[in-house]
A protein has these predicted regions:
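Generic N-terminal amphipathic, Lys/Arg-enriched alpha-helix
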Residues: 1-4
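Active-site catalytic loop in hydrolytic enzyme cores
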Residues: 53-55, 65, 82-171, 175-179
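Short, acidic/polar
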Residues: 10-18, 157-163
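Cys-nucleophile CN-hydrolase/nitrilase-fold catalytic domain and related Cys-dependent amidase chemistry
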Residues: 7, 16-96, 100-105, 111-112, ...
Length: 179
């Protein structure tokens, strides 16, 4: 999905794409990394912190209602404001009945020219998370499958996939902004 600087237009476009995928029979729909805006991590700009939001919050509420309406699981990648000065690159998982199942915070944060993610994001909380925890590697028991969610750069570190698989994930999802 191509994005613009218009957050509301991007959200509406994502909603339309979710509806299209559901109409074609999709059961689990994963949006791209940080879908609500252009990929902003190519520059270090304090104004971009205004893009962050609480999770759960308005986006997860809207996607929960949509998931329930369509009977699909939605994986949404959002810029999370956890506390003042504490931000994460986070995915929220909404089950097919609209229930917010929880979140996963990106563990591996790149910092290379064009990918200044360490300027914006704190790594996720590692540890022996249980299914009810809001931290660490975890699985989400959805209506359709036990899923694991990791984010973009996490794919270059095989222990993330291994841990999540050993925890019982049937399938892994990796929302990414860079392909």
């Amino acid at each position: 999905m191509s994005c613009t600087s218009d957050l509301d237009a991007n959200f509406a476009k994502a909603t339309a794409r979710i509806r299209e995928a559901a109409a074609q029979g999709a059961q689990v729909i994963c949006l791209q990394e940080l879908f609500k805006s252009l990929y902003f991590c190519d520059v270090e700009d304090h104004q971009n912190f205004e893009l962050a939001e609480a999770i759960p919050g308005p986006s997860t509420d809207a996607f929960g209602a949509l998931a329930k309406e369509l009977g699909v699981v939605i994986i949404a990648s959002l810029f999370e404001k956890r506390a003042h000065g504490l931000y994460h690159n986070t995915t929220a998982v909404l089950d097919a009945d609209g229930t917010y199942l929880g979140k996963y915070r990106k563990m591996h944060i790149p910092d290379d020219p064009g990918y200044y993610e360490k300027f914006y994001f704190t790594p996720g909380d590692a540890g022996g998370a249980q299914a009810s925890d809001e931290i660490g590697y975890r699985i989400f028991e959805t209506k359709f499958a036990k899923i694991g969610v990791l984010i973009c750069w996490d794919q270059w570190y095989p222990e993330a996939a291994r841990i999540t698989s050993l925890m019982g994930a049937d399938i892994l999802f990796y929302p990414t902004a860079i392909g």
